[in-house]
Amino acid sequence: MLMLELKDICFERANKKILNHINLVLEKNKFYVITGPNGSGKSTLAKIIMGIEKPDSGQIIFEGKDITNLSVDERAKLGFGFAFQQPVHFKGITVFDLLKLAVGLEIQEEDALRLLKKVGITSKEYLKREINRSLSGGELKRIEIATVLARNPYIAIFDEPEAGIDLWSFQSLTEVFREIESTSNGITLVISHQERILNIADQIILLEKGQIKQIGDREEMVKTIFKDSSHVEEENYE
């Protein structure tokens, strides 16, 4: 069942230790949530798994192969997908274009709309809109998450997917994650403070000061985490 292993991962930035000897095994068919205080290294860990950042030391093993030095593109070809906390803009590219690029095939508008509806966007008008500042932060975030889902990746990484979206969209997104949790044959890894996302997880990883403080099954970890509410944010939305 072993799929992804991080061995003794360390990472520094400006002489500050961000991640300190991280050892972690992620298995197929599991939904993981990484949580912890702000500044604990959660997003950095996600970016290292995707290849956006490179560790100063340690190894990343994917299905028995050392991928530590592989680029983002090379990892994407292996089935890694990533949704940023702050989505990027694509001047001159429409939402429909972006979804087609994500799928890698010619798709019909109905297929694209089906992907958007999963993240709470129901209007066909969005397909013609450009990925630029005319879209709100919440809209950009939902569209980016849709592109990750479109790729059907083996390892899907979502960095705080709840950031910048309204309550209705978050409820819709929670249902998407529930579906992923029950049907995915790969690994889903979500960075989140939100109780409703924590309650979907098979396992929760608690980071603190760049180290894994605790990892365990949802029932066990939720009890621990809610004893210290600093790890969990109130559900405030736009």
Show the residue positions of the predicted features.
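Catalytic Walker B motif of ABC-type/P-loop ATPase nucleotide-binding domains
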Residues: 156-160
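Q-loop/switch helix immediately C-terminal to the Walker
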Residues: 86, 92-108
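The feature captures the beta-strand-to-loop junction immediately N-terminal to the Walker
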Residues: 35-37
